[in-house]
């Protein structure tokens, strides 16, 4: 019997659970899969227990070891891929490497504790890496007798979210008990269903990669006698068609405009190339020496070259093959963006003397050449070809 075909008719959304250690992120993940399997039995909705989610396999993403559990489930209207990172360090690494791009997240806060240090850090990281839609799940309400206390905790969470520029007064807060729902208490199961209905309604359907403006990182350039210059690479987002006007952005002082005269894949002519395709793009009016690896081909005006930005970075530990010693202000490694290395200097935040292997930190970077970057662009930090860190652009400065 063939496996059931993957159903593309439902919109797909990436979601995750975030919050302080032991506030119930993994229990909630187990509860969502279990309650949906009971209430909406489909081939996708299979119950996952706490132990199987908690024993997340190790993955390596850009040289960094991360434990993450991936589960899937569906509601009447959507298909969800859900990530749960068991450890705090795993969560930070996931966010910073872009290993887990979330369209929205469920912030789990234990009603018995209220917001804790990692609650704050996860909210800040969500803000920095561009997770714009948070839903709050106040967990463990069965352990709190005092209604006023729940109100105070909710106010405290809303204030904290507002402090980090989330719409604290307006975003949804749902009070429940993941453990009670998991144990089959129907009152608490109803609350899990309400949480999923809220996710369906509050987290907007993500824009598909093909609908975004074209971005094609240039990997290779060659010229075809009599036809012109070909740039090849994998289309990161958007689409490219013959006769499109494009810009060549980064590395050089000036952004150059050109027109696409051909799109090829596997030596065949195409009408258009889509996000994910490896293509060769024939460009009219571009000399072989006017385009190079490390630049990007982009929809005009959609992305600009920059030399200064702030980034959230994770520095690999010694065990992950990173540095054995700390680095200090004005450290000058290479920053690897998409297809190329560019040297840059690092300025540490005020009051931070040094950064140890295994730390995460906000840095200001100044590159020696401009590169096409925007908020959310990921990069690696390298020394002599060896990855020593990983980061994501949180703010453009110049």
Curated annotation (Swiss-Prot):
Q: Which InterPro entries match?
A: EF-Tu_GTP-bd (IPR041709), EF-Tu_GTPase (IPR050055), EFTu-like_2 (IPR004161), EFTU_2 (IPR033720), G_TR_CS (IPR031157), P-loop_NTPase (IPR027417), Small_GTP-bd (IPR005225), T_Tr_GTP-bd_dom (IPR000795)
User: Where, per UniProt, does this protein localize?
Assistant: Cytoplasm
Q: Which PANTHER family match?
A: ELONGATION FACTOR TU, MITOCHONDRIAL, ELONGATION FACTOR TU-RELATED
The protein in question is named Elongation factor Tu
Annotated Pfam families: GTP_EFTU, GTP_EFTU_D2, GTP_EFTU_D3
Q: What is its EC number?
A: 3.6.5.3
Q: Name one GO molecular function term.
A: GTP binding
Positions binding GTP in this chain are 19-26, 84-88, 139-142
Q: tr-type G domain location, by residue?
A: 10-207
Say which species the protein is native to.
Answer: Streptococcus uberis (strain ATCC BAA-854 / 0140J)
